[in-house]
From Swiss-Prot:
Name this protein carries in UniProt: Pyridoxine/pyridoxamine 5'-phosphate oxidase
Subunit structure and binding partners: Homodimer.
EC number: 1.4.3.5
Cystine residue pairs: none
Task performed by this protein: Catalyzes the oxidation of either pyridoxine 5'-phosphate (PNP) or pyridoxamine 5'-phosphate (PMP) into pyridoxal 5'-phosphate (PLP).
InterPro entries for the chain: Pyridox_Oxase, Pyridox_Oxase_CS, Pyridox_Oxase_N, Pyridoxamine_oxidase_dimer_C, Split_barrel_FMN-bd
Origin species: Pseudomonas entomophila (strain L48)
Keyword line: Flavoprotein, FMN, Oxidoreductase, Pyridoxine biosynthesis
Pfam families for this protein: PNP_phzG_C, PNPOx_N
Cofactor list: FMN
Pathway: Cofactor metabolism; pyridoxal 5'-phosphate salvage; pyridoxal 5'-phosphate from pyridoxamine 5'-phosphate: step 1/1; Cofactor metabolism; pyridoxal 5'-phosphate salvage; pyridoxal 5'-phosphate from pyridoxine 5'-phosphate: step 1/1
Residues that hold FMN according to the record: 64-69, 79-80, 86, 108, 143-144, 188, 198
Residues annotated as binding substrate: 9-12, 69, 126, 130, 134, 194-196
Length: 215
């Protein structure tokens, strides 16, 4: 390592986040920030990429990067194999957290809340617009389970391709969407000298309350 970890840092130079810029509820601000990210961030950064954290039945946390695939006034939707590790975690503990980080904008959004499955129709609607290879992969891959090697996975894919050679694959029952229903959303804007802006929204008795947190 050529540089000490203790010396690795960047200075944040963009404008701050004032209460006057923040609406009374968080979804409008998220939509605004997300639109900024779509316009500003460039590959390899994906604007809809986020880290999802779940907790298993033994209380151990796990995190991984996923893609946000739908957003409405109810919450934030992602799709996965329901039998995967994350699916098992959510079945045991339906609370999760997600974090979006947009480095070009020096912004981060943290979201916490309860997770629920979306409807079968919502899952099927999204499944049908995925590329064919991804639709076949949802059938072929025993996600999160141990396999012998890459050849085993490729064999499963070939068998799935043969199975659906004469018909279009339909959405498997073991695959679909989850929606995180937010109870807390924090907007973080990097500022100079690590004196960052943090505006936190909490859902209290069905109403959003906004507050500033110390950096």
């Amino acid at each position: 390592m050529t540089q000490s970890l203790a010396d690795m840092r960047r200075d944040y130079t963009r404008d701050g986040l004032a209460e006057a810029q923040a609406p009374g509820e968080p979804f409008a601000l998220f939509h605004h920030w997300f639109a900024d990210a779509v316009k500003t961030e460039q590959l390899p950064v994906e604007a809809n990429a986020m880290t999802l954290a779940t907790v298993d039945a033994d209380g151990r946390p796990h995190c991984r990067v996923l893609l946000l695939k739908a957003l409405d006034g109810r919450g934030f939707t992602f799709f996965t194999n329901y039998e995967s590790a994350k699916g098992q975690h959510i079945a045991a503990n339906p609370f999760a957290a997600m974090t979006f980080f947009w480095p070009a904008l020096e912004r981060q959004v943290r979201i916490e809340g309860r997770v629920e499955k979306v409807t079968a129709k919502e899952s099927d609607d999204y499944y049908q617009v995925r590329p064919l290879g991804s639709r076949l992969g949802a059938w072929a891959s025993p996600q999160s389970r141990v396999i012998a090697d890459r050849e085993e996975l490729e064999g499963l894919v070939k068998a799935t391709e043969a199975r659906f050679s004469d018909t279009q694959p339909h959405c498997p029952e073991h695959w679909g969407g989850y929606r995180l229903l937010p109870e807390r959303i924090e907007f973080w804007q990097g500022r100079a000298s690590r004196l960052h802006d943090r505006l936190n929204y909490r859902l209290v008795d069905g109403q959003w309350q906004r507050e500033r947190l110390a950096p």
